């Protein structure tokens, strides 16, 4: 449950005097019995948002007397698809997903309000910051373009996971030298979900 307990625990001193923390994440897509690792950024951070688009309702036969929130909201969803493809470097990892678009009403009634919810993932804090900036810019532009009122709630709740490179290599080397039954492999960053990751035997 966002924002999780780690931040509060750290602020209360749970890591005082601690040099390193080792964490384990179980993934069903990985080969059973193996240990996978990666120095640096390895798992994406997350944010989520809710956007309320307030227009003016009306009858379907008289669109000129209304301000269609569904049209404005649909434009936002479409424009959002360009954030990753046109605002991020090809070498950055980011994704924006719209998981909910609530505009249910009657077939002959122009909807006065829609609510949109989305999920944001970024492999670095800088990537997440760029996506957040663009979402806020688009919501503001929506007001200017369609004359609607937008209320945006943006929650940046989980940072990206960063493994200290030197310590990570030390742990991997130690496991390899222990000659245990399981393999030790380096993996690609986990971007947004549990994907089958390409791996390289070391």
Identify the function of each model-found stretch.
Residues 25-27, 121, 198:
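Anionic group-transfer/hydrolysis microenvironments
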Residues 28, 156-158, 199:
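Active-site-proximal loop/turn and secondary-structure-junction residues that shape catalytic pockets
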Residues 71-195:
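Metal-dependent amide/peptide-bond hydrolase catalytic core
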Residues 12, 31, 51, 125, ...:
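Short alpha-helical interface patches
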Residues 57-58, 125, 159, 202:
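Generic "edge-of-domain/loop-turn" microfeature
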Residues 194-202:
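Single conserved hydrophobic/aromatic residue that forms the stacking wall/gate
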Residues 1-111, 192:
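Histidine/acidic-residue-rich, glycine-tolerant segments that coordinate divalent metal ions
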């Amino acid at each position: 449950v966002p924002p999780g307990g780690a931040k509060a625990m750290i602020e209360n001193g749970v890591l005082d005097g601690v040099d390193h923390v080792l964490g384990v994440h179980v993934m069903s897509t990985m080969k059973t019995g193996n240990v996978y690792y990666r120095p640096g950024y390895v798992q994406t951070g997350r944010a989520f948002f809710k956007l309320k688009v307030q227009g003016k309702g009306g009858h379907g036969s008289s669109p000129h007397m209304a301000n269609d929130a569904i049209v404005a909201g649909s434009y936002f969803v479409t424009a959002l698809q360009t954030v990753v493809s046109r605002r991020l470097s090809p070498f950055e990892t980011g994704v924006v997903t719209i998981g909910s678009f609530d505009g249910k009403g009657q077939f002959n009634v122009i909807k006065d309000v829609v609510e949109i919810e989305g999920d944001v993932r970024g492999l670095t804090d800088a990537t997440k910051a760029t996506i957040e900036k663009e979402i806020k810019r688009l919501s503001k532009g929506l007001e200017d373009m369609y004359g609607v009122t937008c209320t945006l709630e943006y929650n940046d709740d989980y940072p990206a996971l960063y493994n200290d490179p030197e310590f990570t290599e030390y742990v991997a080397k130690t496991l390899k030298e222990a000659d245990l039954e399981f393999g030790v492999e380096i993996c690609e960053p986990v971007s947004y979900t549990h994907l089958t990751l390409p791996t390289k035997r070391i």
